[in-house]
UniProtKB/Swiss-Prot annotation:
Pathway as given in its UniProt record: Metabolic intermediate biosynthesis; chorismate biosynthesis; chorismate from D-erythrose 4-phosphate and phosphoenolpyruvate: step 2/7
HAMAP family from the UniProt entry: DHQ_synthase
Identification of the protein by name: 3-dehydroquinate synthase
Primary location recorded for the protein, binned into one broad class: cytoplasm
Gene Ontology molecular function terms on file: 3-dehydroquinate synthase activity; metal ion binding; nucleotide binding
The family this protein is said to belong to: Belongs to the sugar phosphate cyclases superfamily. Dehydroquinate synthase family.
InterPro entries, alphabetized: Dehydroquinate_synthase (IPR050071), DHQ_synth_AroB (IPR016037), DHQ_synth_fam (IPR030963), DHQS/DOIS_N (IPR030960), DHQS_C (IPR056179)
Cofactor(s) needed by this chain: Co(2+); Zn(2+); NAD(+)
GO biological process: amino acid biosynthetic process; aromatic amino acid family biosynthetic process; chorismate biosynthetic process
Keyword line: Amino-acid biosynthesis, Aromatic amino acid biosynthesis, Cobalt, Cytoplasm, Lyase, Metal-binding, NAD, Nucleotide-binding, Zinc
Source organism of the structure: Escherichia coli O1:K1 / APEC
Enzyme Commission (EC) number: 4.2.3.4
UniProt GO cellular component terms: cytoplasm
Length: 362
């Protein structure tokens, strides 16, 4: 069992990583006997895990209600958020309730925002079931829903009480979802840890076959990196922005193509190549390093070009609505070397458009 602490003073919390955690009531601390829980999951995961998690919580004396949401990025919306509020109010659940997010990034982000908003804030626990959510979205307290004009535009910073990562969940993950998660894994190597990127080049095949020790190390390292960044910059005023490598381009793809048509990790993968091409055009990143990124993403089964039906010009309106925009100016996360990156302002739209075009004609 691995345990990492996200250090935020009184709001610090543990990330527990192991197999078989759904069999242990102690995994779900700080829940105690007699407490009330609303378990939030989706229609795909409910048949796999709902009864198991409900059973282990009830074994610990916890009172459990549940709400099952439709599955898909297109349902990360205000309308679906309202169904969670309705379920909480119908019982009713008070300010002493705990929300448990059992699912991937959509369930985790939406449940976290529900917890941040319901009666001005109730406790919640993240139980991520996808690789993407285990290595990234469940850690750090970013909660949100989408708007038709932009991804994650309505949300809050709100930290969980704990994160429970059961490695056994990956056994039921479709290959496309596994690849999507690997995009965020590869991102950490590009922006922060060149040695980890080297390790990924050597061990990607083991991750694709869900080798236990390799996957446990991979998730632990990603969570360590994320925890360090969040502890240093919880509200994304500086360092934490680096975690958005590929996301400015990727969110544009998701919004333009319709949420759910491109998985988040797929869009981020293409976006990371666009960021690398942008950095190349600025003369601060080598084509050889871009090729290393492309090769690793391709081996993971991820796209390295944008959608053919999306023109370079179609990216700009979405990118100019990005949350990192300041005074109307785009701020891009760009690699400087494998393992090192920067937040860059003042890049001309023409250069960005040419970099995007590089990734359409490649």
């Amino acid at each position: 069992m691995e345990r990492i602490v996200v250090t935020l003073g009184e709001r610090s919390y543990p990330i527990t990583i192991a197999s078989g955690l759904f069999n242990e009531p102690a995994s779900f601390l700080p829940l105690k006997s007699g407490e009330q829980v609303m378990l939030v999951t989706n229609e795909t995961l409910a048949p796999l895990y709902l009864d198991k998690v409900r059973g282990v919580l009830e074994q610990a004396g916890v009172n459990v209600d549940s709400v099952i949401l439709p599955d898909g990025e297109q349902y990360k919306s205000l309308a679906v958020l309202d169904t969670v509020f309705t379920a909480l109010l119908q019982k009713p659940h008070g300010r002493d309730t705990t929300l448990v997010a059992l699912g991937g990034g959509v369930v985790g982000d939406l449940t976290g925002f529900a917890a941040a908003s319901y009666q001005r804030g109730v406790r919640f626990i993240q139980v991520p079931t996808t690789l993407l959510s285990q290595v990234d979205s469940s850690v750090g307290g970013k909660t949100a829903v989408n708007h038709p004009l932009g991804k994650n535009m309505i949300g809050a910073f709100y930290q969980p009480a704990s994160v429970v990562v059961d490695l056994d969940c990956l056994k039921t993950l479709p290959p496309r979802e596994l690849a999507s998660g690997l995009a965020e894994v590869i991102k950490y190597g590009i922006i922060l840890d060149g040695a980890f990127f080297n390790w990924l080049e050597e061990n990607l095949d083991a991750l694709l076959r869900l080798d236990g020790p390799a996957m446990a190390y991979c998730i632990r390292r990603c969570c360590e990196l994320k925890a360090e960044v969040v502890a240093a910059d919880e509200r994304e005023t500086g360092l934490r922005a680096l975690l958005n490598l590929g996301h400015t381009f990727g969110h544009a793809i998701e919004a333009e193509m319709g949420y759910g048509n491109w998985l988040h990790g797929e869009a981020v993968a293409a976006g990371m190549v666009m960021a690398a091409r942008t950095s190349e055009r600025l003369g601060q990143f080598s084509s050889a390093e871009t090729q290393r990124i492309i090769t690793l993403l391709t081996r993971a089964g991820l796209p390295v070009n944008g959608p053919r039906e999306m023109s370079a010009q179609a990216y700009l309106p979405h990118m100019l609505r990005d949350k990192k925009v300041l005074a109307g100016e785009m701020r891009l996360i760009l690699p400087l070397a494998i393992g090192k990156s920067e937040v860059r302002s003042g890049v001309s739209h023409e250069l960005v458009l040419n970099a995007i075009a590089d990734c359409q004609s490649a």
